[in-house]
Amino acid sequence: MESRGPLATSRLLLLLLLLLLRHTRQGWALRPVLPTQSAHDPPAVHLSNGPGQEPIAVMTFDLTKITKTSSSFEVRTWDPEGVIFYGDTNPKDDWFMLGLRDGRPEIQLHNHWAQLTVGAGPRLDDGRWHQVEVKMEGDSVLLEVDGEEVLRLRQVSGPLTSKRHPIMRIALGGLLFPASNLRLPLVPALDGCLRRDSWLDKQAEISASAPTSLRSCDVESNPGIFLPPGTQAEFNLRDIPQPHAEPWAFSLDLGLKQAAGSGHLLALGTPENPSWLSLHLQDQKVVLSSGSGPGLDLPLVLGLPLQLKLSMSRVVLSQGSKMKALALPPLGLAPLLNLWAKPQGRLFLGALPGEDSSTSFCLNGLWAQGQRLDVDQALNRSHEIWTHSCPQSPGNGTDASH
């Protein structure tokens, strides 16, 4: 075996160091590696309680007993928007919110000293664990991410012990007032996980509710949209991109990553007649049907976009190089056009109302007229839907609860 002298070894180490520094400058930023979850740590909690602004847990603190004025936690998410935590002594004139918008931390603050909304720091919606700390120092609020100070707000607060209302509430994953009361509204529900959290001064804590999140954070995830069996999202057709007028045309695209079971994938209809036009999964085939007439099918191929194109005379189902067309009878055109004319016209994703469906599936996206739809913006959706993540293994997400 060839041996290297001290000089050669030193040169090799110097070369490796220079290469590392070079890649760091080119964007391979060095990040602190957070330790993995220990068996002694409490389990991570999921931050979403479903649609709406309901928090998963609420804690109350006696500010007259506060000696520690900082809170810290680790958060992991693929979701670019939502509330991490909210705090107040009075929801009308003294409140604070830390959330994400476009993947980056955002602080909203309203009190006697300041009213502001400010975003700062790196994107946190990359599916990794990030350490976050919020501190109060005198009249300042500090935000640290992964050990680095990313924001310092001066002259925005007084001492906690001088608050007119000496009881502070902290809510996780939601708000204690309507989302419209925020200075800059956002979608409160955050599809993310939180662990190793420490809130203010434990000695000053008066009460704490048990977390009510619907999902376990033990499952490794990838970005996407996951619908467990029997779940659905419902969009008003007037709230999504509209059909092309001349000639009339409308398209839907599904990026299927995982699929199992049998049942509906999507449908166009009304609450009274939800399946005027539908796609459902059966025997590893995607079946297109219109009303009670004959349908057509394509073999299920995961990873290729599944596209549905509607025109005045036919519906085309395609995936990759395979394509089939379903002719529409002349009498079928009026109900199709009426779906967009009626306020109750709907796009259903997943199980139909009242359907006993065993289908579970993961999408890397859902598009109408080429524009991505956000499940958080659905008219209604099941609480159990994973709005921005999918289990890495198909079987792991079917039991989504703790």
Curated annotation (Swiss-Prot):
Mitochondrion is among the record's keywords: no
Source superkingdom: Eukaryota
Domain Laminin G-like: 45-217, 224-390
Signal sequence annotation: 1-29
Protein name per the record: Sex hormone-binding globulin
Carbohydrate-modified residues: 36, 380, 396
Matching Pfam families: Laminin_G_1
Encoding gene per record: SHBG
